[in-house]
């Protein structure tokens, strides 16, 4: 699915399926550093990683023919993103016929210490009625 989104390829997003979940990984890359003194990941890279993780999660689990369209994205930065691999998991809170709400958590050391959390709302292809 990464080939469908050039930005995903640019920042290096990887995805692994773990049963009914997807684990997204953003490998440490010097190209993704925003503050070279710390060094710390650029906040926009973290946001883009989380938004794409949510969109790809929906793409996989809804079987939609195309990438869902973002309606709204709200992100809370909780800790600095260090220069190391970053991981994310998504949870669909609600999915209707036209809109889906997704929660995203990103971490580096352990899921118990997230570096950011986000909520995303997507317009999805209207699902056929039974």
Q: What kind of region is each of these model predictions?
A:
Residues 1-6:
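N-proximal, solvent-exposed amphipathic alpha-helical segments enriched in charged/polar residues
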Residues 9-11, 20-22, 67-73, 84, ...:
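A generic structural signal for short beta-strands and their flanking turns/coil linkers
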Residues 11-40:
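Catalytic strand-loop segment that frames the active site of acyl-thioester-processing enzymes
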Residues 26-28, 77, 124:
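Hydrophobic residues in beta-strands and at strand termini
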Residues 38-51, 55:
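Compact, glycine-rich, soluble single-domain proteins
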Residues 55-87, 92:
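Hydrophobic beta-strand-centered segment that forms part of the acyl-chain substrate-binding groove
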Residues 81-83, 87-130:
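HotDog/MaoC-like acyl-thioester-processing domains
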């Amino acid at each position: 699915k990464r080939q469908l989104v050039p930005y995903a390829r640019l920042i290096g997003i990887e995805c692994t399926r773990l049963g009914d979940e997807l684990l997204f990984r953003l490998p440490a890359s010097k190209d993704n550093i925003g503050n070279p003194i710390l060094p710390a990941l650029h906040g926009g890279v973290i946001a883009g990683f989380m938004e794409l993780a949510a969109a790809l999660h929906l793409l996989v689990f809804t079987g939609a023919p195309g990438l869902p369209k973002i309606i709204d994205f709200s992100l809370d930065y909780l800790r600095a993103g260090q220069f190391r691999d970053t991981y994310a998991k998504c949870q669909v809170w609600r999915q209707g016929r036209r809109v889906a709400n997704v929660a995203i958590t990103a971490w580096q050391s352990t899921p118990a210490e997230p570096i950011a959390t986000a909520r995303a709302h997507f317009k999805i292809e209207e699902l056929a009625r039974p």
